[in-house]
Amino acid sequence: MEMPMDLTEVKLRRKDVFEGKIMTVHVDDVRLPNGEEATREVVDHVDGAAVLALDEANRVLVVRQYRYVFGKVLDELPAGKLDPGEDPVTGALRELKEETGAEPETFLPLGKLLPAPGCYGETLHLFLAKGLKFNQQQLDPDEFLNVERVPFDEMVHRCVNGEIDDAKTVAAVLRAKVLLNL
C-alpha cells in the first residue's frame, strides 16, 4: 500500500486586499504538494456561534431576518459573531439573549461548522439550549428581525427538503436530530 501524500500547502507570500470590521481579504501564493505554485483567495472572518433553542413544547426559536447579500428574508437560528477574545459559549448565550430574550437552563455543544473551508476562514460554534426563560430582546441598533416558534419535526423537514438553506441552521438541526434522538 502506497504512503499517503502530504497534502499541506505552504504559504509563500500574502497580499492584503481589504480589511473591514468583520473580515479581511488576502491573496496568498502557496507551494502545492507537487512543488508547483498556486494562488489562494482567502476571506478571514471573525468566528461566530449559533443556538438551536427549544421551548417547552419542543419548538425551535427561529429568527427571520433580511439578508442583504441574498436579497431576501431567511429563517435562521439565533446567531452572531464572537467579540474579540470571547468564549464561544459566552458569545452564543449573549446572541440568544439579544435576539430572542431567551436564557436557557441547559446548554449543550453541537460541535463546530466550517461554512466554506475552500476560501472562508470562519468557525461557527453550534449549541443546543433548553429550559428557556424569556425576557426582552436586546437587539443591536442595526438589527431588525422577527422570532417565530417552529415545531422541531417541521424544522427537520424544512432543512431536509431545502426550504431552509442556511448552513448553520441545517447543520445544528440535523445534528440535534441524530445525536440527541430528538
What are the residue ranges of the model-derived segments?
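Short glycine-centered helix-capping/turn motifs at secondary-structure transition points
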Residues: 162, 178-180
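Hydrophobic residues on conserved beta-strands that form the core of alpha/beta folds
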Residues: 25-27, 39, 63, 77, ...
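Acidic, metal-coordinating catalytic segment for phosphate/diphosphate chemistry
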Residues: 14-50, 56-57
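Short helix-loop capping/hinge motifs at secondary-structure junctions, enriched
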Residues: 59-60, 133-135, 181
